[in-house]
Amino acid sequence: MDASLLDVAITALSVLLEPERLFYLGMGTVIGLALGIMPGVGGVAGLALLLPFTFNLDAYSAFAFMLGLGAVTSTSDTIPAVLFGVPGTSASQATVLDGHSMAKNGEAGRALSAAYAASLIGGLWGAF
């Protein structure tokens, strides 16, 4: 059976864009944002906590759920680092140094915007 690369890519895209997969991707993203805001509960702990919920899912939905959760925890740990001075994970330790002092001076929005812009640029650069 000879399948071209384009046929396989179209099949993979159709599987990815099914509403059930998009729902689990969105749920993983929302839960990952909530877990990332809590200091000490990062991506690895979140994946370990939510792994039992994936046992009854098909492989694609479970992967979409875990991918959504893992992708946003390093972005959402910026919130406690800037606002409270407590790094959510080790990835946000440097954010505490500049971001929390900016928040003390009333520039929390500017610190969060800079952190999210850097996260966006890094994510896009890493994707390509």
Question: Could you say what each language-model-derived stretch is?
Answer:
Residues 1-60:
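Helix-loop-helix hairpins and the membrane-proximal interhelical loops
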Residues 7-11, 58-68, 76, 107-108:
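A cross-family phosphate/adenosyl-ligand binding-site feature
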Residues 11, 94-105:
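Short amphipathic alpha-helical coupling elements at transmembrane boundaries
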Residues 16, 89-90, 106, 127:
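Residues at alpha-helix boundaries and the short loops/turns that link adjacent helices
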Residues 18, 27, 67, 113-117:
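Internal alpha-helical transmembrane segments of multi-pass membrane proteins, especially GPCRs
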Residues 29, 33-37, 41-47, 73-86, ...:
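Transmembrane alpha-helical segments of multi-pass membrane transport proteins and ion-pumping complexes
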Residues 46-50, 67, 95:
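Hydrophobic/aromatic residues in alpha-helical transmembrane segments
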Residues 60-64, 101-121:
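Membrane-interface alpha-helices at helix entry/exit sites of multi-pass transporters
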